[in-house]
């Protein structure tokens, strides 16, 4: 079995570091770091998630309450759901606590709506099929776009599309980009694109102008 490690201050545990700012007592708790690699090898992922769930079950069997910290909302592309589903199947009592989705927070920081009236809204993991997803009607949100920055930016420029982007939303290192031209070729993992078609409301407003 892979070794689990204590999640200590200098580890890159984003959710843990955020919680420490508002709940200092977390340092008094037993904190375990469960590796969640961002890979596409399905068999390897199943093995890792099975091990992580079994390890968590051991803590529950000791009579302890276990909290899985995650950023954003746990129901949206969150690694915690892989553990949650397994524990639920094993008969343990589980509960999901809703959070603020990154794309809602990003839209608020950019001071824009995500959709209006009959506009469609598409939430897309940027690591899968950027070009195909761009053909969707309505607002496209590409989450965790850091590794696909160059590809997304190139497609936007080649097709004369306007986009906005937020990097590290809500963090000290947050950066806002209000146009395709401003968006860099490279950015961090927590980069989120918002690409909007012109909505009917906007068209009506433009006609009024």
Each PLM stretch: what is its role?
Residues 62-77:
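Conserved Motif II region of HX4D acyltransferases
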Residues 9-43, 158-166:
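P-loop/Walker A phosphate-binding loop and immediately adjacent motor/lid segment at beta-alpha junctions
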Residues 3-8:
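Short, small-residue-biased leader/transition segments that mark boundaries at the very start
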Residues 9-12, 101-104, 171-173:
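Short gly/pro/ser/thr-enriched loop/turn and capping motifs at secondary-structure boundaries
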Residues 33, 37-61:
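Glycine/small-residue-rich loop that forms an oxyanion/phosphate-binding "nest" at active or ligand-binding sites
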């Amino acid at each position: 079995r892979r070794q689990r490690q204590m999640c200590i201050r200098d580890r890159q545990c984003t959710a843990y570091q955020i919680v420490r700012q508002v709940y200092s007592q977390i340092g008094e708790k037993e904190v375990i770091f469960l590796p969640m690699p961002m890979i596409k090898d399905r068999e390897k992922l199943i093995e890792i998630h099975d091990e992580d769930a079994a390890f968590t079950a051991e803590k529950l069997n000791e009579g302890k309450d276990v909290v899985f910290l995650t950023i954003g909302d746990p129901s949206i592309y969150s690694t915690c759901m892989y553990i949650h589903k397994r524990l639920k199947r094993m008969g343990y009592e589980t509960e999901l606590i809703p959070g603020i989705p990154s794309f809602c927070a990003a839209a608020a920081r950019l001071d824009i709506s995500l959709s209006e009236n009959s506009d469609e809204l598409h939430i897309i993991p940027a690591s899968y099929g950027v070009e195909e997803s761009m053909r969707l009607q309505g607002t496209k949100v590409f989450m965790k776009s850091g590794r696909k920055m160059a590809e997304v930016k190139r497609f936007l420029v080649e097709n004369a599309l306007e986009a906005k982007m937020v990097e590290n939303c809500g963090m000290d290192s947050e950066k806002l980009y209000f146009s395709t031209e401003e968006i860099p070729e490279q950015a961090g993992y927590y980069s989120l694109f918002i690409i909007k078609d012109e909505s009917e409301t906007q068209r009506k407003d433009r006609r009024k102008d």
